[in-house]
Amino acid sequence: MDALSKSMKVSRRSFLKAAGLATLSMMLPLEWASGTRRAAAEATDPMRHVINRLTWGARPDDLEKIRELGIEGYIEWQLHPEQIPDPAIDQLFQAEPVLQASYHQAKRIEQDNWQLSYKLMWTRLYRAAHSQRQLYERVVEFWTDHFNVPISDSAVEKLLDDREVIRKHALGRFRELLFASAQSPAMLYYLNNDSSSKEHPNENYAREVMELHTLGVDGGYTEQ
């Protein structure tokens, strides 16, 4: 291993260690107040109320930003995440290139499914604590829950589903998000479409897309 490789490895390890500790320190004060104290604070401070609803917790910088822009200005700013600089996440991408890798690149970089699974879970926590695109991260979490795909089946497919389906369409049209999810290898594998055929169709995805993703259990349709 040459000196540059060693330097990069140490830098990466140092970054991950520091980032992990920083993430924990950031997450601990997010629930600093009891429900009663928080409700009282929000009642007297509408800006804090908005921050607590749109973000993962009122950080000092968030409160400064909403006071600078005003409530409407802050919401408008958060609705355009592509225009918000996010240096903490840029550093994360530099430390973990697998997060932006293609399918085949990711397979080469991370051959241990559980190791990549851990990284994806840790990354979600890190983004929640450090990203400036807080509303975007909240919406990503909502759609991730709605179009649920377990991380344990295949972490690489989950990585691509998160990036190319959920994050790409999080603030876009639901129709486009639904179609992207319907073509996601992670979703198709999870709901057994990899074993579905014309002669022996598997109805798992069809049932889930009707009951959970769109119309609901009593949505005015039958299984006939």
Regions picked out by a protein language model, each given a short descriptive name:
Residues 1-11, 21-30, 34-35:
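N-terminal secretory signal peptides
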Residues 15-16, 109, 159:
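Peripheral peptide segments
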Residues 30-57:
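C-terminal segment of N-terminal export signals and the immediately downstream linker at the start
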